[in-house]
Every structure is written in structure tokens, then in C-alpha cells.
């Protein structure tokens, strides 16, 4: 592609004579950068469309017509001719295992077709490491493998017998360890299932390597733990974060809510910030653990850091709040439900209603954790998939918020897959009265793991999965995300899935979730821009292209509002700017 950046040096007299409608316009202070001749989707309150933008000192100083933009061009102004391309606010991922996934082998590649491909990927990764070093990966899904079965320890032993291996499933709620990892973690035939977890076993009772829910923590204890530093050198962690930031920029993405953070990972972020290497804004959600004491430790640590919307680096790094879990996943049928899970769409997983995270005794502890964090003035995000889990979450929020009078903490329901009518009404109440109760939903679930989801939720529940239309009609805002590495992080997939609601493999038809809960691209884009910015406490700085806001901008090859919705998935980002600086440019 020909470069579309060029610098214009124009005579001042020419500029003064080029006002709109042929009328002379007073010269404005020259901008650092002007974008012209495009379709600029602003996502402002009127969803206005403009032709041009002017930027100075990283902030937008003008949005409007081409002729008026020329007033901002001076001798040193850089001008970008968009040549009819489309500019939007930079896209935002409101729920992503950003830094954690950066440290892992990605097995969510569509080119991985079978278990042999997984073995080859693991072997190639392990061959780069010293013997004995952990291999950690994520993103595999048996539903996308030709064998349509779990990977086992025996499979992984072929790939890396001299390395402990743990591969997290794409849902993040189970994984598989090889024999060395099981040995190092002390998992044997005699090891009991932990509360809230299951060790998968063969007919003789031996562990197969598959560890579900809390059972996976037995392995994670040996491999570094979700959200931890994973024993990797600090420089390796920094390099991996920079690499995923660049990947985000290539997809027109400029901000992320990074979940399951701990002090070690936050210190890596601070180092990168000090080195002025950030190209993605990061709101961090800190792992709250499963006890009163664990949440108290996080509260104490966060007291030492700026409280959102205050930040480090002018909105680049925020010490956001606390992440809690109340249940499991839809992929593993461990989400906490009122009725039994389905299997294979029309079958029933008899007696399996899932269970609370951390065991049956945890829900009252969770409620106390929410109360403590709310009293401390901290934002809380709770993983809640099943309908019973979502009810428990919103009721816990309401109880804590009404008791404390807290306002503006923006407590969120992460995933919020199948909310009941009660949950939806409570979300609306909390949003209206307390600025809290916001779903942070992953539309790509319906695509990337949609075939598994459809089979597990069953025909009736499928139709109320991620009910975006209902939320919109109730006046409920939500923020979009990927849950990477559960699904690929490119937000264009989320835009497409929010509108289309189609599955990856059409195992139960292309649209088992129906289309009654679809919304249009205008709404979908809000969920990945201004509504997501709200959940990062940054809506006054980013999320729309308006005068005074940071110039976080994505430039696309096609007009998002005019192309058929089926083409949203294939959008190509041509340029990304963060705070007015080019972070990515297509060649």
C-alpha cells in the first residue's frame, strides 16, 4: 500500500483564503497533526460524522469539515490524507488477560486443526527453553480439534518430556498438565478433588492431566499462577507486554482492562511507563483471591496507588480495582446455574448445575469481600457466567452499595452470560442510582466458543445468551471485551459478533443464539469505545473523538457504518494513534 502520510508546507495566504463555503476563515493556532478527507465516526452524543480532525499536544483541538480543518495547518503541521478511509476512536477491550497471555504460548490459532498440531507447537516452544523450564500455553479448544477430545498428559509427554507443561483451555476454567507437571505439583491417584474443582481421571482413577476449575490451581501453584510473574525474567515479561501492545495497535486498539494483576506484574508496567514505552492504556484489575484476608491485602496495596480516575502517566496506567470469581465457565459446564446444564444441545447433564467458585462455602465470603472493597471505595469486577451466579453478584453489589452509599465505583458483572429478569432489573437500578452494575460482556464467545456454548446452554437458554437488545431497551450500558486468550483479541471480531451472533463451526446451525438479541453496528461500536472507556474510568479522556479528548484514533480500510455487517470481521486497520502519536501504520 502506498504511504498516505505526507507533510504539507503551505503559504499562510493560501490557508487564509480557504474557508468553508468560500468565506475567509481566521487562522487558528497551527496543530501538530491534521487528518483530512476521511469519514470520521466520532461516537459523540449525536454519533456525528466529520471529515477531519486537528490534534495538538496529543489532544483533539478540532473536529469538522475539511475546509475548516485547513485553518489548523501551519508550516510544521503534519497532514494525513485519509483518502476516504474511516477513522474511529481507538477500540477498547474491557476484559482481557493481557499481560498474563503475553507470557504464554498461544494455542488459539485457527491453523491448529488437531492434537498433532498442538504437540508440534508445544515442542517448538519447549525447544527454545532450558530443560526443566515451565511451558505455559492457552487457547486450546477440543471442540476445534479433529479428535474432539481433551488433550491429555500422555499427548504432552510426547512434545516436552523434559519440561513441565500446563496448557489452559480457551475458557480459562480448565487445563491440561503433562506428567512432569503433575509430578512436580504432587498430583497423584490419591490426590482428592479440591473444593470447587475436579481432577479428571481415567477408568483406573489415575489423573489424565485435565484439571478443572480449582483443581487447576494445584498445577498453577507450580507454574507461577494466573496473573503472576510465572517465574519469567523481568525483561522477558516486559518484552512480552510490549509485543502484545504492538499487536493491539495493529488491530486499532488503544486501551485495555487487564485482569488478574498482582504487585509484581504492576511493577513491570510501571517500569515500561517510566521508559515511555506504553502504546496501550492499561486499567489493572487486581486478583482478590478467595478469602477475607486476601481481599484485605489487595485493599492495603491499592491504598498506596492513585485511585481511578486518577492515573499514572496521564491516563496510561490505572490501578483499577479488585477481581473476584463467583463461579466457573460455560465451556466446562461449571457455571453456577438454577437448572441442570445441557450437553450436545438437547441432552441434559443430569445433576450438574455447576457450582460456586472456591467451593460451596464461598458465596457468603464473596459477599463480605464485596462489602469490604466497596467500603474502601474500590471498583469490583466479578466473574459471573451462570444465571444463579449473576443474581448472587448483583444482589451482593446492591447490598454493599446501599449499605455504604457508595456512588460511582462502577462495579461490573464480568461475562454476564445469561442474566435473569431479576438481574437485568437490578443492573438497571444500580446504573441509574449508583453508577454501578455494568456487564462486561464478550460477544466473541458466541463465535469462537459458540458451538461448545450452544451445546452446553441448550436451545432455550441459547436465545437469552448475551441479551444485548434487551439490555439496550432497558437503558443498560455494557462494555465489550475479548477475554483473551479465551478468544482472539481483535475487537473487530467483537463488533461483528455483537451484530451477527454467529458461531465458528455451525455445529448446531449458524445462529443457535438467534438474532432477536442482535444490535446494530452503532451500538456495537459504543460498547467497544465510549461505554468501555467508562469502565476504565476514562470516558472524559477517550472513547469518542471530541475536542479536548486524547487523540486515540483507529483508521480503517472501510466505513464501519456502511459496509454489510458480515464484513466487520474482516476490517483492516491502516493506522493507529495514541495521544496523537502514530503507534502503528500499515505498509
List PLM regions with ranges.
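Signal peptide processing junction and immediate N-terminal pro/mature segment
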Residues: 18-27
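A short acidic, amphipathic alpha-helical/loop segment
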Residues: 155, 267-272, 392, 396, ...
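His/Asp/Glu-enriched, well-ordered alpha-helical/loop segment
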Residues: 371-381, 388-411, 416, 421, ...
Amino acid at each position: 500500500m502506498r504511504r498516505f502520510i505526507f507533510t504539507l508546507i503551505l503559504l499562510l495566504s493560501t490557508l487564509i483564503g480557504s474557508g468553508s463555503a468560500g468565506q475567509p476563515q481566521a487562522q487558528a493556532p497551527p496543530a501538530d497533526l491534521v487528518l483530512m478527507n476521511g469519514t470520521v465516526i466520532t461516537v459523540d452524543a449525536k454519533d456525528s460524522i466529520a471529515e477531519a480532525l486537528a490534534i495538538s499536544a496529543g489532544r483533539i483541538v478540532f473536529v469538522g469539515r475539511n475546509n475548516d480543518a485547513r485553518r489548523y495547518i501551519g508550516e510544521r503541521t503534519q497532514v494525513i490524507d485519509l483518502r476516504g478511509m474511516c477513522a474511529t476512536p481507538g477500540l477498547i477491550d474491557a476484559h482481557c488477560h493481557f499481560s498474563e497471555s503475553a507470557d504464554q504460548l498461544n494455542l488459539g490459532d485457527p491453523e491448529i486443526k488437531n492434537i498433532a498440531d498442538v504437540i508440534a507447537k508445544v515442542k517448538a516452544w519447549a525447544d527454545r527453553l532450558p530443560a526443566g523450564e515451565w511451558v505455559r500455553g492457552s487457547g486450546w479448544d477440543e471442540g476445534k480439534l479433529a479428535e474432539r477430545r481433551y488433550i491429555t498428559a500422555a499427548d504432552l509427554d510426547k512434545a516436552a518430556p523434559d519440561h513441565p507443561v500446563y496448557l489452559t483451555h480457551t475458557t480459562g476454567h480448565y487445563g491440561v498438565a503433562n506428567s512432569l507437571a503433575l509430578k512436580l505439583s504432587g498430583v497423584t491417584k490419591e490426590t482428592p478433588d479440591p473444593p470447587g474443582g475436579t481432577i479428571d481421571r481415567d477408568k483406573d482413577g489415575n489423573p489424565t492431566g485435565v484439571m478443572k476449575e480449582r483443581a487447576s490451581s494445584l498445577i498453577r501453584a507450580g507454574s507461577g499462577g494466573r496473573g503472576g510473574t510465572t517465574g519469567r525474567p523481568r525483561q522477558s515479561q516486559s518484552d512480552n507486554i510490549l509485543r502484545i501492545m504492538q499487536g493491539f495497535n495493529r488491530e486499532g486498539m488503544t486501551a485495555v482492562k487487564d485482569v488478574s494483576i498482582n504487585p509484581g506484574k504492576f511493577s513491570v508496567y510501571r517500569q515500561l511507563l517510566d521508559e515511555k514505552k506504553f502504546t496501550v492504556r492499561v486499567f489493572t484489575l487486581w486478583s482478590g483471591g478467595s478469602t477475607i484476608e486476601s481481599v484485605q491485602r489487595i485493599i492495603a496495596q491499592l491504598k498506596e496507588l492513585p485511585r481511578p480516575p486518577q492515573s499514572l502517566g496521564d491516563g496510561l496506567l490505572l490501578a483499577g480495582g479488585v477481581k473476584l470469581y463467583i463461579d466457573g465457565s460455560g465451556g466446562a459446564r461449571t457455571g453456577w446455574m438454577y437448572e441442570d446444564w445441557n450437553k450436545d444441545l438437547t441432552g441434559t447433564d443430569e445433576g450438574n448445575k455447576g457450582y460456586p467458585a472456591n467451593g460451596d462455602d464461598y458465596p457468603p465470603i464473596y459477599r463480605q469481600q464485596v462489602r469490604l472493597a466497596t467500603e474502601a471505595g474500590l471498583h469490583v469486577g466479578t466473574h459471573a457466567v451462570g444465571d444463579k451466579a449473576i443474581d448472587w453478584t448483583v444482589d451482593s453489589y446492591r447490598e454493599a452499595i446501599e449499605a455504604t452509599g457508595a456512588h460511582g465505583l462502577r462495579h461490573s458483572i464480568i461475562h454476564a452470560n445469561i442474566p435473569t429478569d431479576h438481574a437485568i432489573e437490578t443492573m438497571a437500578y444500580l446504573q441509574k442510582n449508583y453508577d454501578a452494575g455494568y456487564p462486561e460482556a464478550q460477544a466473541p464467545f458466541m463465535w469462537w466458543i459458540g458451538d461448545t456454548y450452544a451445546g452446553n446452554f441448550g436451545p432455550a437458554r441459547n436465545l437469552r445468551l448475551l441479551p444485548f437488545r434487551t439490555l439496550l431497551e432497558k437503558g443498560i450500558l455494557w462494555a465489550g471485551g475479548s477475554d483473551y486468550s479465551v478468544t482472539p483479541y481483535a475487537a473487530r471480531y467483537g463488533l461483528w459478533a455483537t451484530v451477527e451472533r454467529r458461531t465458528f463451526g455451525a455445529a448446531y446451525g449458524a445462529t443457535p443464539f438467534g438474532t432477536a438479541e442482535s444490535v446494530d453496528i452503532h451500538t456495537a461500536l459504543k460498547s467497544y469505545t465510549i461505554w468501555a472507556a467508562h469502565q476504565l474510568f476514562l470516558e472524559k479522556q477517550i472513547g469518542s473523538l471530541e475536542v479536548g479528548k486524547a487523540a486515540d484514533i483507529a483508521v480503517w480500510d472501510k466505513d464501519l457504518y456502511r459496509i454489510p455487517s458480515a464484513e466487520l470481521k474482516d476490517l483492516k486497520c491502516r493506522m493507529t494513534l495514541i495521544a496523537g502519536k502514530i503507534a502503528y501504520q500499515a505498509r
